[in-house]
A protein has these predicted regions:
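Alpha-helical assembly-interface signal, strongest on the long, hydrophobic N-terminal helix that forms
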Residues: 1-66
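Short, conserved structural patches
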Residues: 2-4, 64-127
Length: 127
């Protein structure tokens, strides 16, 4: 009498091989999602810094902070904003540039995010 061939033994370990093949794709997608979230966070922080810098630059307080100090104080400690101020008529505009941090290995730079905020200067009649 003849035995039927055993085909089940050849599939042993197939799931592990498929998992190992899919793991790099899963890691790349996860890192891309994390990097996208960090880029959005950097943009949000740049906007916060621009508004804080414009608010400080439009203040008529004599001992008030300058725009760069206010922008730096308004963001997380691991973000280093660069602020530039321009006066135009009865308003002040502050532009803040923030570098996007990278979490992806072997990729050095994802560029910068730039946000601008404009605030009115106080009227001289109010003094």
């Amino acid at each position: 009498m003849r035995r039927p061939p055993r085909t089940g033994r050849r599939d042993r370990g197939q799931a592990a091989i498929e998992y190992l093949g899919f793991l790099p794709v899963l890691l790349i997608v996860g890192l891309a999602g994390l990097q996208l979230g960090i880029a959005a966070y950097a943009a949000q922080q740049a906007g916060t810094a621009a508004r804080a810098g414009a608010r400080a630059a439009s203040s008529d307080a004599e001992d008030g902070p300058d725009a760069q100090a206010a922008a730096t104080a308004a963001v997380s400690g691991w973000i280093d904003p660069a602020a530039s101020t321009s006066l135009g008529g009865d308003e002040v505009t502050v532009t803040v540039t923030v570098r996007i941090p990278s979490v992806v290995p072997f990729v050095g730079d994802f560029g910068t995010v730039e946000k601008t905020a404009t605030m009115p200067l106080p009227d001289e009649e109010d003094e």
